[in-house]
Amino acid sequence: YNLGRIGFRLLREDGTEAREIDLGNARQEIDLWTGVVYSRFELNRKEVKVRTVCHPDKDMIGVSIESELLNDGNMSIYLDFPYPDGRYFKHYIGRYDTISGHTSTFEKLAPNSVRITRTMDDTHYYAPLDWTGPATFSRESEKAHTFLLQPRHTSTFSFTCCFSPEPVADVTEPVASIERKS
């Protein structure tokens, strides 16, 4: 089943959520030798550059972002966790609108590190998240299974996230370390 999704929450200059039509000059390339994905696009006349890497031996990704949208507060990272339902497939597998039947909690491990704990019946898994740079981490609402990582006062930002069956700390690695291993 789907463990969760990680994405960007993008805001237009007026503070409303951006849609795909608001993005310009979108381009994405994958280096077939290393597996690194390079993405770029524009929003609010500002360029966004993203580098995504995947660990070869762990369920871990690393993401580096360069954009003034971070500094403006118009770009954040979300982590969203569904209720597993293999029969429901609209955009992603799972029900993101189902609040009951599963729990999502988080604990702060260090100033730039949290661990999200997921529970569904007898199933437990963990999603530790580390980042570099100033940011706030919060739950979107008490009932939601969505968490927001909001970079502050920076135009460059990176984070790593891992999915693990064990509640281990220090499971993530810096983006550059993951990239060297790929």
Regions found by a protein language model. Give the residues of each.
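Acidic/polar, glycine-enriched structural segments that form the non-catalytic walls/loops
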Residues: Y1-S182
